[in-house]
Structure formats: C-alpha cells, structure tokens
Amino acid sequence: MTIKIILGEHQITRTELLGGIVIVSGCGAVAYCISKFWGYGAIAPYPQSGGNRVTRALQRAVIDKTKTPIKTHFYPLDSLRTVTPRRASDNGHAVSGAVRDAARRLINESIETVGGSKFELNPNPNSTMGPRNHFHFAVGDLAQNFRDDQPAADAFIVGVDVDYYITEPDVLLEHMRPLVLHTFNPKKVSGFDADSPFTINNNLVEYKVSGGAAWVHPVWDWCEAGEFIASRVRSSWFEWLLQLPLRCLGLERVGYHKIHHCRPWTDCPDRALVYTIPQHTVWRFTWIDTEIHTRKLKRITYQDNTKPGWNRLEHVSDNNQLLVSIGREGEHMQITIEKDKLEMLSGLGATQSVNARLIGMGHKDPLYTSMIVQYYTGKKVVLSVAPTVYRPTMPRVHWPVTSDADVPEVSARQYTKPIISDCMMMPMIKRWETMSESIERRVTFVANNKKPSDAVAKIAAEFVSLMNGPFIDLEPLTIEETVERLNKPSQQLQLRAVFEIMGVEPRQVIESFNKNEPGMKSSRIISAFPDILFIVKVSRYTLAYSDAVLHAEHNQHWYYPGRTPVGITDGVCEFVSDCDGQVIETDFSNLDGRVSGWMQRNIAQKAMVQAFRAEYRDEIISFMDTIINCPAKAKRFGFRYEPGMGVKSGSPTTTPHNTQYNACVEYTALKFEYPDANPEDLFSLLGPKCGDDGLARATIQKTINRAAKCYGLELKVEKYNPEVGLCFLSRVFVDPLNTPTTIQDPLRTLRKLHITTRDPTIPIADAACDRVEGYLCTDAHTPLISEYCRMVQRLYGPKTSTRDVREARRSRNKEKPYWLTCDGSWPQHPQDALLMKQIVVSRTGIDEDTVDKLIGRFAAMKDVWEPITLESEESKAAQTIDEEGVAPGSVDESLLKLNDAKQTRSNSGTSGPHTKGGGSGTGNELPRSTKQRAKGPRQSAGLPKQGKANSKPNGNVAAGQAQHGGIPRGKTPSGGKTNARRAPPKAGAQPGAPTNPK
C-alpha cells in the first residue's frame, strides 16, 4: 500500500512512516527527560550542595522519586493527667520515683489510645512482660529473662531511663517506628533532680539515688535545637540481598524523624519526655552531598573549653531568657546567670570590677558573687573523696483513693529498710480525708441492724443466763476503788483535774481519731469518751462485773481477758489437748462496727442488769444508751458523723463485751450442732475467747458461720494445721499438743517491725532500741525476728542515750508489747528452735534457705541502711493507692459513697485540721439519729477542750494512751483442769454430765 504525497509524486511505505514516528517520539522523550533531569540541577535561591550540576541533579532526582511518607499520629501529652505526681510511700526518692511512674503510665496510655503496641528496652517486671529488648546489665534486669525481640509493625519503642547507655541512636531509630523516652536531660550542671543529687565530671553524669543505686552515664542531646534527624533504615536479609545492586552503586536508604521534647513535670524540670515521629524514607547516593538538612545526635559536652575544670550549660527559661549554668566538675555547687550578663562580666579586666558590676546589678549574695569570680579566674580545686550518708527511706504510707494530699504526711519513722517489700502502711492521721474514709469503711458501710429470729434470741438469752450463773445482787465498785483501778497515766492526769466534781453527770459525746499504727488497709478508729467522769461511771460496773462474774470459775474456761501470758498458753494447750488437736481459729471481721444494737441490749446490757441489784438498773441502762447512741465528732477536725450502734473502741466495755458476743456466737453454733444437748454441758464446751479472737472445736466448723450470720456478723474460720501452727491473740502456738512455746505472728510482725511511731523528737537510736528490746523479751528465740532485733540493738546501741535518760521518758513503754508492760512474757523453749523456724517458713512463704541467708545477713551487717528487703510476689495492701497505682479492689461501687461523704464533711477552703475546737452545728454536719438518745440534758456542741496532755501530738505525753492498749488487766482466774468437763458430746446425743458440777 502506498500513500500519495500531495506535494509530489514520491510515495513511502507504512513501515517507514511508523519508524519515523518512533524516532521522532524517542528523540522528544529523551529531550524531555534531559530537560527534566537538567531541571534537578537548577541553581537554588539558597545555599546548595557542592559538586557539579550533574551529580547534584542525580542526587535530587533519586531522593525525589524514592521518597516514601510514613503516616503516624501520636501526641502523648493528651494523656498527661498530672504535672505533680506523688507516691504513697517515701523510699528515699519518692518524688523522682513518682515522676518516673507517672511517665510510664503516660506513655502506656498514649500508646493504647492510638492502638499501638509497646516494645520496651530493659523494662522492669511491673512495666511489661511482652515483646522487649532485654539484656542483663544491672542486677534489676535479672528479674526477667534475656530477650532480643524485633518491634512489630505497630510498635512504639519505649525507653525509661535507659537511653544513656545506647551506643548509637540508630539502633532504635532504624525500625522507622515512633520512639518514646523518659530521660534525664539536666538544665543545670549539678544539683538535685527532685530528691536525688547529681554532679557532672568528665562529661559523665554521676547520679546517686537516696534509697536506690548510683549511676554514671553520658547524656544524648535530644533537647538540642533542630527538629529533624536522620537514621539508617533496617532491612531484612532478603531485602538486603535484593538491594545489593543498588548498594554497589553507592545508594543507601535513610529515614527522617521529627524529634519532640517537653518537660511536663513541675517537680523534676531536669526530666524530659522525648518522642520521635518518623516522616519519610528515601534512597540517596553516599558519594554525593545531600541538601536535606538534619542534625546529628551526639553526646552532650558539658566541659567549658575556655575554663578547664569547669562545666557550662546554656538553656532558655520559661520567660524566654537565655541562662547559663556554671559549676566546677564533680562539685554540687552551681549558679545560674543570664548569658548576656556573663558575657559582659567575662570581658572585664579585674576581679574587683566583676564584684562591683555584680553588686550594681543587684546580686549581693556572697555565695553567688564568689562563684562568678572563681569562674572568671578559672580557679580549679582538687575534688575531695568522702562517703555520703543519704536520706533514709520513710515508711510506706496508706493513701486513700479519695485523698487530696500532695505529699505523704506521717510522723512515723523507719530505723532500717523494710524486711519484706509488702510492708505495712502508716495512715496520714493529720489528713481529714483519712478520717472520713475510715468512718465510711469501718462504721457506715458495716452498720448492722439485723434482728435475730425468735429461736436465736432464745439461745442468746440462754447464754446470758449461763454466763451470769448465780449472781443476781452485785454491787458496783465505789468511786475510790474505781479511781484506784484506773491507773493509766492519762487517766490519772484527768482524774486529778476533775476529782472535785466527781458526782456531776458526765457529758455524752464521742471524740474519735485515727489510731497511729501501721496496717494494710484503712486505719482503725478510736472512739474515745473524753469525759473521764463517764469512764469512771462505766468502770464501776464493768470492773465489778468482770471480777465477780466473768472471772468466776464457771466462766474461766472461755473468758481470757486479764490472764497472764503463761495462763493463756496453759489454757490454750489444755483446750487443744482436750480436742485432740481438732480445733478452729475464729476471727471476726470488724466486730466493733458490725455489732448490732440488739446484741448490745440483749447480751451485754441484759447480763449486767440481771447481775446487779435492781436499784442500779437505771444507771446501767443510762450508760448503755450513751454507748449505743452517743453523738460523735472527729477530735482533730471537728466534723460530726453518725457513729452507728457498734462497739465504741474507747469505752471500758469494749474488750469484755466483745468477748461475750464472741462466746455467744459460738454457743449458738453449739446449739445448732447439738440441739438436744444440755445447755450447761454446751456452755462448758466453749473455747478460749478474748475480744474478737477465739478458738473453738472443729465440730462446729460448718455451723459457726451460720450462727454469726444470724447476728449479722462476718467470721473467718481456719482449721488448725500443725504445719502453720495455731494463732490466738497474734501469737502462734507452734505445737500446742506438746509445748507451750509461742511466737509472734511472723508475717504480721515482719511487715511492721522496722517502723517506730515514737515522737520524732526522740533520737531514732533510742526509739529503735526501746522497740526491739520488748521483742527480745517476748520473742528471744523467734527466727528472723530475734536476729533482726539483735542487729538493730548492736548497730544502734552505741548511739543511744543513757539508760537513765531513756527510762525517764514517759513514752518509754509506748511500743513495748502489752504483755511486757504487765510484767509477763510468753513462754519460749530454746529446744523448739527448729519447730519455730518451720512455722516461720510456712506462715511467711519465705523458703528456709532464704531465711538462713537473711539471718546471716543480719549478723554481718555493718550499717542499718544496708539493703535487706525481700521482694513480695503480690501486695496485700487494700483501699489505697500504692507505688504502682490503685491497689486491686480499692475502687469499686463504694467510691461514689466515699466521695459523697468526703464532700459532705469537707470544709470550705481547707482540708486541714481546725485551729479551734468544734463549733455549733454547721452545714457540714451529717444528720444524727435522735430517736434512741439517752434521756437527760444535752450539752451544746461547742464542747470545751480537755486537758492539753490528752490532745498534744507529743509522743511522750500520748504514751499513756497506748501503754495498755491491748487486753485490760484483771483478776487471773484460778481453778483445776477441765478436761472431763470439755469432752465433746456425741453427735445427736446429749453430752455427758460434767464430773465437777457447779
């Protein structure tokens, strides 16, 4: 086929035409590419890379055509909840530790909110157990296994106080994932990071932690100016092989990251939160200069190149001033001055001129001016090497979830580090939120209005009749006899003040306060009756009733208050022997708060009304009305609250009445188990009782809980296990069938043995030795406890005051065991040492090898602050915010009620204690029950204060209140063995008659 050309007769073929078109198009394309490529070599309107135009165009073209954006949305400060985090306990570095914990929580939450996963570098066990890079460099790293995982596609790489030890940042950045760091990046050359001192020597930070370790490391310049950094990009082996031809041409793949930093922690301005966001990856020639400007991360050089021996660091302040921190290498002294002033001073010709200019600028502090002059002259000094004693740790603090406290506020002290990490906590008794929460948890939430059935009420009446026995015409003690029996120092002081008005009707009011003692949950409340006249009035009857009835022969087998330690151990061993070891431990949950008004009326009140002569009944009913329905207020803070009908812990009736309620529950269980038995025979089967502690026969293990519920009470039952011993009155009987040896409950004791609540003005050595001396009297052979006490005595002994000075203090016995103040001690036989160790191992969960190592550690210690703490696998702390956050179970449906009560009781503008006594009714008061108040005149709510000795927060004065805080002294019961009387009846049959009928 031919094509005719209009401009001539020449003809061409189609093939020739298509070939021509291809040639023309190719030439055009080449021309276009050349023009575009040549365009990459254009001269920019700002500085450009060196080299010729061809290489410059080649580099620009490769970067432009290979750039790959990486889209990541991440802003961690959206998860910032507080800038002043606080810890519940002071471990020597509470503030810096709280900031680290808060940073960890912030990082975790911010990652979770964007759906990412966490990949952490050398985390602690409480942080993560997931994918991580974990090498063993520090002792703490051994808590987790060695791992070298790779970050996932959605991973955020996290480092908390570890980036200093990285050899090069590219090992973290090459994954092209966000990097989040909590790091130390100081703005001054020495000083304190919150509560931990640091210095800088040879460009290395020397950071020493009170209650922790010492660290030496350089610092990366994350916070330097320049927002973009470059890194290599990690490739798999397969990708690396595919890219090998490109690498042979001199190409490399790099990534660009945007770097951010902030300093959100008010108390730790030298701590920074650093995070990088990957932006792009590109290919580029290594042999051609790049025009993309980034900064290179490097170690910070603190040394001043113009002043050898000095460090210098500049930073911009919050009000946009350029400041300079200067100080000698390795020294703690540093000063901060405006840079323009320092530059001006550096140009002066004489030191006198420097001083004159500083004074003229308003700097008159000799310390400040001297430091500037020394820097001006470049004066160097030889560093002294001396040991440093760092601040001791403070007790672990119970921190209610509703508390508004900023810092822990406790007066208790530690004299060694805790023996076990899950130690007891001290309540913040100066905080009104602590009082409010204790009221809710120990009074309001457990209030009991349950009325038993007719059958159970009949059993209770039967118990009262058996308990009273033949006594129907008792006489109360005289006032003189009662005053003689009230021998506590605080009571004697009050009695002398009111002796002339002894016949006046006492005031009806309760002033409560938190007991300053360590515990694992909300602190106990002491509901005290401040009017000593009321104590005298009640004690006339309670003491007479205890002497005549409760210590009578027919009650001595179960009523244990008033017995000596030897009498208690003999009675317990006899009871366990009678039962052939088939016994159970009973322990009521919050018996004081859960006792109902019905129980108090129909057991305790009924017993006394029937035992005393008729003319005393009105007075008995009167003081029982007061105990059950008396109005109450917080002694320290002044707010009123509804105290409920429970037992009031500051009343003389507390221990004897609680013991009666305890025995009544067991008697009810015996009636359930043996419904056809003789009442007198069942009564003789009651086990030892003292307050809410008790022992009972194992035959009623299934019925005693049912009996407790009939009265609205909660009871915990444990069957005696020879491997863990038998616990009664916080003493563990190691083998009651064969030996009377007892030991302190080891776990409970080890949790609090390192704490003293003595007045802080008393030297710590005196307080420590006074405390451990008591344990060495009662537990001289108890493993761990005795060795620990001897260690404290050995190391603190040379530092104590003289024996006369220590004995002269009124609080000398404040922390002595109750039994020691009563001239009694628990029996311990040295030959039972192996058995005692086995019980300690079983009850604490600490294996025998660890116990032996710890005992050896105590013997070898040279300093009381050496680390001895054993890590607990789990915490038993409750109703608190602990070191790692809110303790499990502390936030539940009760939180709203706690907050409501807190708001109701709060005072406008303050949460601290009142400076004045309680005033008249205010809008802050809670409604009070008035239907069942005792009859008679009521005084105004504006009550006069009692004697100052009763209310001073002074350990020496308050000691009298705690010297006999346990079981009241009384008449020691006597009598012969009761084995035959206690023989258990056969099931379904009537028990045999006792051999010694009463």
Curated annotation (Swiss-Prot):
It is an enzyme of class 2 (transferase). The active site is at D692 (for rdrp/tntase activity). GO terms for cellular component: host cell mitochondrial outer membrane; membrane. It catalyses: RNA(n) + a ribonucleoside 5'-triphosphate = RNA(n+1) + diphosphate. The chain crosses the membrane at residues 21-43. Its EC number is 2.7.7.48. Residues 91-282 are annotated as: Capping. Its main location: host cell. Residues 985-998 have a biased composition (Low complexity). For RdRP activity. Keywords: Host membrane, Host mitochondrion, Host mitochondrion outer membrane, Membrane, Nucleotidyltransferase, RNA-directed RNA polymerase, Transferase, Transmembrane, Transmembrane helix. SUPFAM superfamilies: DNA/RNA polymerases (SSF56672). It is a single-pass membrane protein. Its cofactor is Mn(2+). GO terms for molecular function: RNA-directed RNA polymerase activity. The keyword Transmembrane helix applies. It is found in: Host mitochondrion outer membrane. It comes from the Viruses. Residues 901-998 are annotated as: Disordered. Homododecamer. Forms 2 stacked rings of 35-nm in diameter, arranged in a crown-like structure at the opening of virus-induced replication vesicles. Interacts with protein B2. Belongs to the nodaviridae RNA polymerase family. The viral bipartite genome is composed of RNA1 and RNA2. The N-terminus is important for both membrane association and mitochondrial localization. It may also contain a RNA methyltransferase (MTase-GTase) capping domain. The C-terminus contains the RNA-dependent RNA polymerase domain and a structurally disordered region at the very end. This is RNA-directed RNA polymerase.
